[in-house]
């Protein structure tokens, strides 16, 4: 289920790239460029931290959803997709975190 939801959201975000910025929040962010998108991602990340400190699970889920959404917009700005991140996570699955980190420092 999660993958299909991410795919549907990704498809909508990609379609919004060519939408009128006055009619679409996503198109507006993409039109304003990377700095505006990064500002939103940072803002949403801060809200995730605050929600975590609040110890309210539903609020945390809400804010993480916002962060994921805005991160997907950032990926789209760079012509990447959520699927690219899922592929990277799949690549790392079953790999020790310490081994993965060591492999990064070697390359």
Swiss-Prot record:
Compartments, record wording: Cytoplasm
Q: Which reaction does it catalyse?
A: 1-(5-phospho-beta-D-ribosyl)-ATP + H2O = 1-(5-phospho-beta-D-ribosyl)-5'-AMP + diphosphate + H(+)
One Pfam family hit: PRA-PH
- Which Gene Ontology BP annotations are present? L-histidine biosynthetic process
UniProt EC number: 3.6.1.31
Give the range the annotation lists for the signal sequence: none
Q: Which GO CC terms are listed, alphabetically?
A: cytoplasm
Please give the name of this protein. Phosphoribosyl-ATP pyrophosphatase
Q: Please, which domain of life does this record's source organism belong to?
A: Bacteria
Q: Which GO terms describe its molecular function?
A: ATP binding; phosphoribosyl-ATP diphosphatase activity
Read off the InterPro entries from this record. HisE, PRib-ATP_PPHydrolase-like
What are the alphabetically sorted keywords of the record? Amino-acid biosynthesis, ATP-binding, Cytoplasm, Histidine biosynthesis, Hydrolase, Nucleotide-binding
**Gene name linked to the record:** hisE
> Which family is it part of?
Belongs to the PRA-PH family.
- Pathway entry: Amino-acid biosynthesis; L-histidine biosynthesis; L-histidine from 5-phospho-alpha-D-ribose 1-diphosphate: step 2/9
Enzyme class of the recorded protein, top EC level = hydrolase
């Amino acid at each position: 289920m999660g993958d299909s939801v991410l795919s549907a959201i990704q498809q909508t975000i990609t379609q919004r790239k060519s939408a009128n910025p006055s009619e679409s929040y996503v198109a507006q962010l993409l039109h304003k460029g990377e700095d505006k998108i990064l500002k939103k991602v940072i803002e949403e990340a801060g809200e995730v931290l605050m929600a975590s400190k609040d110890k309210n699970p539903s609020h945390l889920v809400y804010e993480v959803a916002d962060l994921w959404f805005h991160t997907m917009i950032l990926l789209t700005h760079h012509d990447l997709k959520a699927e690219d991140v899922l592929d990277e996570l799949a690549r790392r699955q079953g790999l020790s975190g310490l081994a993965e980190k060591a492999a990064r420092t070697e390359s």
